[in-house]
Amino acid sequence: MKMKKFAALAAATVMSVSAIAATSAFGVFATTDAGVNNIVIKDSDTNRVYKAYQIFDQASATNTIKWGQGINGDALLTKLKTSGLNTYMSQFDSAENAVDVAKIISDADHWTKEDTAKLAKAASSCIIDSKSVTAHEANGEYTINVPSAGYYLVVDATENNGVDKANSALILNVSGTTDVTPKRTKPTLTKQIKHNENEAWGDVGDNAIGDDVEFKITTTIPSDVSAYDKYTYTVRDQLSEGFTFNDNLTYKYYDADGQEITSVTVGPNTTVGDDSSTTDYKESFYVTFDIKELVKNYPTVAKIETYYSAKLNEKAKVAVTAPDSVNNNPNTAYLTYSNNPQDKTGKENGETSKITVYDWTFSLVSNKVEGRASCRC
């Protein structure tokens, strides 16, 4: 059966996390084999692993579509009927072969981002690994030489190992040379402390024992999380022993233009105390946001500000003279987030860098001046 129009579906490219950017590039299925067919991925990260799997093959002589050698077609048919594609799920129920699937997704102009991401995710679970073609890297470009024209699932197979990386899966229509530039938007975290004299937010505070010290944690949200069934997003905060947490967390939400989004009803889950799953870090509290639900209800949300205060207690380190590297009462935070939509264990998470702010606390020194007591701090 001839197919002159076939949607080129680019599935969600994940930016640990996250961030994530899902795009759709619609085009025509190649009607002839260009001879030399390759995928060129422009990526400055030279430590990644990219693989390609042929999903649909089109015989150049007859212009007919069949399953590619990199996919288990029967398994994909079953998966498409159960993967919850919002718009086209009922049509897939009657699909029997590659041609049927091609006909359904050739009208993909009205697919949602979630549909597009789920299609790639379904295909990712049905690949034949022994039939993959692995990219070779040179000068910031990964080249995958594929055997013939057709539709390929390109998978970022890089092992994350808990570092700040992200994985992606995308479907491309390949005829000749097809260029790809991965778009990764990962969440970020910054932390600030309010100075007691000028009310400015910064890296260093200057307070006395007994003061309530204010803190602000700012985190960004990936531009698209549609590839994930669930997206982990947890702010982890560690107070030094000189602080007592006041348990007064509040939140503000903003769009990409910095406009505050008010009346947000999708609240986070907060736990005061340590998380046993982070063995190398002792939390004072951690906050988990349901990013999928938040984005569903507030599609423009791009940033979260988390506010709280803590009291400087009698265990605070005191700098007698000038601030030093020891007596500085540190406060550290970082963010853990999902970075692989193909992960079924929920354990493949990325981490932002740990950000630390300090409060230098000075002692009160009493001096006798002509019968009057004075002090300096």
What residue spans do the PLM features occupy?
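Extracellular adhesion/glycan-binding regions together with long Ser/Thr-
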Residues: 87-158, 256-311
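Serine/threonine-rich, low-complexity linker/repeat segments that form flexible spacers/stalks
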Residues: 5, 18-45, 168-227, 236, ...
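Serine/threonine-enriched low-complexity regions used as flexible
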Residues: 44-46, 148-149, 153-174, 217, ...
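Bacterial Sec-dependent N-terminal signal peptides
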Residues: 1-10
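Ordered hydrophobic segments in well-structured contexts
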Residues: 49-57, 127, 141-145, 149-173, ...
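Low-complexity, serine/threonine/proline/glycine-rich extracellular segments that form mucin-like
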Residues: 44-84, 218-253
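Surface-exposed loop/edge segments in extracytoplasmic proteins
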Residues: 200-202, 246, 257-267, 343-344
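Bacterial N-terminal signal peptides
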Residues: 12-18
